Amino acid sequence: MGNINLDFSVIWDWMPTFLEGAMVTIVLSLSTVIIGSLIGLVVVLMKMSNFKPLNIIANLYTNIVRGTPMLLQLYVWLYGLPMLGISFSGLSFLGGTYGSREFITAIVALAINSGAYVSEVLRGGLESVDKGQTEAGRALGLSKRETMFSIIIPQAIRTVLPGLGNEFITMIKESSIVSTVGVFDVMYTNNIVKASTFRVFEPLIVIGIIYFVLTFSLSALMKYLERRLNTYA
């Protein structure tokens, strides 16, 4: 076996590039989870609706998204749908990275993917709330919608927080697939640094450390929030 000769001195000058890529990953993941959570909330309300067509649409969406690879979905949104005349334009006022067509499309594709998983997390949280709470709300004269948003959802937040945190952590890691379509995330910096320094292993180690720091920090934050919520429960 050959000796492993690591030289991080040439990598140090590229730290601003790594950090810039890390910021793109954070923005991409945060945007995805926020939009995905909104989509998930709509989907779970559709699943809980008494209107059968909404149930069918929501379940079909969830099954398709969860049953196909995320990379395939990204390619469909970025390359397939434009052939049918459906595409997203870049937003130049956001800059070359955040406003690029690839970045905007990546957020849409990943958010729609995340929404399917978040809907299941939310459904579990909503179903965990005692049904007596719904009956109490209706007894107070609240409509079904008012009961859901005023009583049920606030109580379910504490239950779903760990699941949403896990989804955020998962998205930080899985968002690395956007590097395959040219989005300048932290994983894409590997291509830049490797081509400029001719070092292969060192950039991967740095990127691995960045991912670990991001996910570990988020995990610690979620545990802190859980403790705070349990304190006031």
Give residue ranges: language-model regions.
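Transmembrane alpha-helices and adjacent helix-loop boundaries
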Residues: 1-233
